[in-house]
């Protein structure tokens, strides 16, 4: 008899627990490196400063392109003028670093004392002559990765509506220079590699090698990526006109997607996210279907990647994984791990936008049915106390959790993996699927190694709860 599970619907619950996630201002750590001509000014208290220093591990005298505008008692009691203080700091930044854009990051404190950053920015911008983008990344309203979402949503509103004539001439000049000495036929052949389709903009901050990989994967299908949000330089933000197509690469960018659709009148391609070979294939297929292109060689590409992952998959096949919820990548990671042969009883997630993640949820459902496993229960804003009771009952082989709960769970004999590592690792596209499994299997491999050494007391069987 086959153990096929009867088709059922995904169940959603909301426990309205507190956000137990990394602070969203941590988005500065990867965004300041991604946008090379930017300067990030975090407006908050000493606590925010300590967090940034510890979380980023960057020494202040290394002069990174971010800084803290530390609020003092005078700011909170309204004895100091916010505008004058911020003007003084921004002029200092302009003099020392001369960035193309200054990004103000609002924190919990600016939210509580009702600092009108959005009101101050336009006036100060016209006075100092540098664009000022305001993004709220407070931990009261947002989970870990949603800090990036607010920054990109603010930047989406700043994307130019049309290419300036000067820029057109400069681009044409560069293209002529690059094609100098090449035959006309070669240049024409390169242009003809692409199918004629409406412009496509991809949004989401990814490391440069991953950006190149995804761009090339689409190029193989004849699809040209007209631009990325964010670009490497603020001055190179993509032109976005009404009717352009946009696609996201991360599941936590729902606000950016909404801004692009409502304010910039773009058409969103609702696809699963390119995490794991299955997600990458589905993402490319969906973009191809929107443009009426028949995808080429994707089935073979996916099969080849799965064969390369088999050594890691053997370690996790038949094991269970439990997501406590932290970075909003949970649905995509669960879908990929279920495809690898794991079971997942519960997915905790701080915030769930069912419209933006619709395609991903449908793919999760389909994957569970194809693999013959039960659908996970999805819990939004989970209550940690209840969650830990469920972990004790279920005894999963691995818990993917925020840093705060990792050591207490390990002490009780439960294998854990920090969810924050998936945020900072390269996990998108076909070739990076191995990195996901490298992270997931590390605690399991460590325990196997300890068992082989005979150190049983350090392994979960001996742990006293």
UniProtKB/Swiss-Prot annotation:
GO terms for biological process: light-independent chlorophyll biosynthetic process; photosynthesis, dark reaction. Its cofactor is [4Fe-4S] cluster. Its EC number is 1.3.7.7. It catalyses: chlorophyllide a + oxidized 2[4Fe-4S]-[ferredoxin] + 2 ADP + 2 phosphate = protochlorophyllide a + reduced 2[4Fe-4S]-[ferredoxin] + 2 ATP + 2 H2O. It is an enzyme of class 1 (oxidoreductase). It comes from Trichodesmium erythraeum (strain IMS101). Binds 1 [4Fe-4S] cluster per heterodimer. The cluster is bound at the heterodimer interface by residues from both subunits. NCBIfam families: DPOR_bchN, PRK02842.1. Pfam families: Oxidored_nitro. Protochlorophyllide reductase is composed of three subunits; ChlL, ChlN and ChlB. Forms a heterotetramer of two ChlB and two ChlN subunits. CDD domains: Pchlide_reductase_N. PANTHER family: LIGHT-INDEPENDENT PROTOCHLOROPHYLLIDE REDUCTASE SUBUNIT N. Component of the dark-operative protochlorophyllide reductase (DPOR) that uses Mg-ATP and reduced ferredoxin to reduce ring D of protochlorophyllide (Pchlide) to form chlorophyllide a (Chlide). This reaction is light-independent. The NB-protein (ChlN-ChlB) is the catalytic component of the complex. HAMAP family: ChlN_BchN (MF_00352). Pathway: Porphyrin-containing compound metabolism; chlorophyll biosynthesis (light-independent). Gene3D superfamilies: Nitrogenase molybdenum iron protein domain. Belongs to the BchN/ChlN family. This is Light-independent protochlorophyllide reductase subunit N. Keywords: 4Fe-4S, ATP-binding, Chlorophyll biosynthesis, Iron, Iron-sulfur, Metal-binding, Nucleotide-binding, Oxidoreductase, Photosynthesis. GO terms for molecular function: 4 iron, 4 sulfur cluster binding; ATP binding; metal ion binding; oxidoreductase activity, acting on iron-sulfur proteins as donors; oxidoreductase activity, acting on the CH-CH group of donors, iron-sulfur protein as acceptor. [4Fe-4S] cluster binds at residues 23, 48, 108.
């Amino acid at each position: 008899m086959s153990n096929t599970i009867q088709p059922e619907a995904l169940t959603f619950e909301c426990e309205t627990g507190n956000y137990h996630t990394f602070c969203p201002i941590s988005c500065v750590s990867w965004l300041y490196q991604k946008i090379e001509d930017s300067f990030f000014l975090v407006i908050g208290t000493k606590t925010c400063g300590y967090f940034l220093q510890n979380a980023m591990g960057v020494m202040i005298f290394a002069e990174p392109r971010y800084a803290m505008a530390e609020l003092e008692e005078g700011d909170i009691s309204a004895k100091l003028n916010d505008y004058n203080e911020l003007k003084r700091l921004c002029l200092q930044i302009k003099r020392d670093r001369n960035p193309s854009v200054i990004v103000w990051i609002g924190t919990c404190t600016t939210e509580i004392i009702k600092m009108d950053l959005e009101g101050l920015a336009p006036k100060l911008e016209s006075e100092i002559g540098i664009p000022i983008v305001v993004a709220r990344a407070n931990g009261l309203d947002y989970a870990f990765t949603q800090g990036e979402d607010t920054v990109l949503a603010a930047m989406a509103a700043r994307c130019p509506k049309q290419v300036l004539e000067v820029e057109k001439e400069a681009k044409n000049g560069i293209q002529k220079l690059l094609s100098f000495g090449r035959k006309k036929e070669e240049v024409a052949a390169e242009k003809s590699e692409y199918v004629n389709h409406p412009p496509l903009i991809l949004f989401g901050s990814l490391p440069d090698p991953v950006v190149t990989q995804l761009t090339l994967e689409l190029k193989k299908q004849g699809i040209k990526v007209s631009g990325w949000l964010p670009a490497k330089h603020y001055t190179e933000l993509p032109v976005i006109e009404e009717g352009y197509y946009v696609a996201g690469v991360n599941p936590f960018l729902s606000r950016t997607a909404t801004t692009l659709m409502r304010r910039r009148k773009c058409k969103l391609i609702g696809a699963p996210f390119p995490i794991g070979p299955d997600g990458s294939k589905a993402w490319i297929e969906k973009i191809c279907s929107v443009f009426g292109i028949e995808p080429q060689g994707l089935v073979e590409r996916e099969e080849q990647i799965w064969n390369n992952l088999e050594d890691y998959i053997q370690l996790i096949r038949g094991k269970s994984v439990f997501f406590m919820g932290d970075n909003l990548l949970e649905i995509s990671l669960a879908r990929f791990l279920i495809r690898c042969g794991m079971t997942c009883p519960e997915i905790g997630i701080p915030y769930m936008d069912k419209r933006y993640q619709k395609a991903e949820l449908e793919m999760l459902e389909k994957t569970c049915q194809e693999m013959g496993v039960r659908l996970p229960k999805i819990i939004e804003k989970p209550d940690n106390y209840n969650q830990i009771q469920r972990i004790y009952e279920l005894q999963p082989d691995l818990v993917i959790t925020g840093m705060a709960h990792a050591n207490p769970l390990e002490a009780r004999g439960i294998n854990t993996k920090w969810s924050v590592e998936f945020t900072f690792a390269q996990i998108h596209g076909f070739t990076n699927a191995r990195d996901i499994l490298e992270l997931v299997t590390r605690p399991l491999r460590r325990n196997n190694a300890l068992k082989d050494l005979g150190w049983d007391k350090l392994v979960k069987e001996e742990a006293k709860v």
